[in-house]
Amino acid sequence: MNLGDLTNFVEKPLAAVSNIVNTPNSAGRYRPFYLRNLLDAVQGRNLNDAVKGKVVLITGGSSGIGAAAAKKIAEAGGTVVLVARTLENLENVANDIRAIRGNGGTAHVYPCDLSDMDAIAVMADQVLGDLGGVDILINNAGRSIRRSLELSYDRIHDYQRTMQLNYLGAVQLILKFIPGMRERHFGHIVNVSSVGVQTRAPRFGAYIASKAALDSLCDALQAETVHDNVRFTTVHMALVRTPMISPTTIYDKFPTLTPDQAAGVITDAIVHRPRRASSPFGQFAAVADAVNPAVMDRVRNRAFNMFGDSSAAKGSESQTDTSELDKRSETFVRATRGIHW
């Protein structure tokens, strides 16, 4: 048996285990943490108690993860504030929320370009004037770029754009809403980061750098606000099937979370207010990188060579990738379920 056969032999059982432990249940909980189900039953903790009577602002609330999370929160009794660029899409989600069985949910819409700091300030002031404050802020909006270093030499704007939306936009929202949270001695800021921050996924340098910047900032801010009962949670989200990943058509063959599963991870974080919410594989990757980064570099390099740049990243007029995954690649993808390569 050569090294390649041995690797493939190991990856197959890993793929089976990965499918089990890296897929959250309907409550947004990864299987190794199911003990929380019992604790919640004993303690009576649920989403209704966490959000009822609370104002919850969600960026990127017009589709995908944000829309799915908004509906869950509204069903549980929270007042949802939806923020995104397109008013029509926001209204569609808001109407779905208002049509919830019973008395319907409460939803407010505020269209805003979240890469424009002045526009964010104006929108935030409107929210404060209309609703008095925000109890839970979910920084979910984001821009992802998958492009190798070789194709990025003349594309500094990729780094600027991702930092503007993923980092500075979220920071502006935090700065606008956290004073009220501190005054009321309650607040929760949930940042939807990426498992890529833990795995250091190749081709995603611009994207994960912007997410890591927000992660580090909020680690520092948490130390300043613990006594104010303001909590920060970083959700290292696995790969989710949303419009954001559609330009990379090879992801059609990757196992992903659904928006509803991802929304469950967020709502579970709202209930428990952990510092970090991560998949088991993401946690393993972070520890492995700390212990032996050289080995992890080789794993990442293998993935880099296994999956090429998309047609969109190459600037091709055709947005269709013709490459197919071979059996080794398929096994590797299943073994690293939820990771964007």
UniProtKB/Swiss-Prot annotation:
Gene3D superfamilies: NAD(P)-binding Rossmann-like Domain. The keyword Magnesium does not apply. One of its GO terms (cellular component) is membrane. Keywords: Oxidoreductase. InterPro entries: NAD(P)-bd_dom_sf, SDR_fam. One of its GO terms (molecular function) is oxidoreductase activity. Its EC number is 1.-.-.-. It holds the Pfam family adh_short. PANTHER family: DEHYDROGENASE/REDUCTASE SDR FAMILY MEMBER 7B, DEHYDROGENASE_REDUCTASE SDR FAMILY MEMBER 7B. This is Uncharacterized oxidoreductase Rv1543.
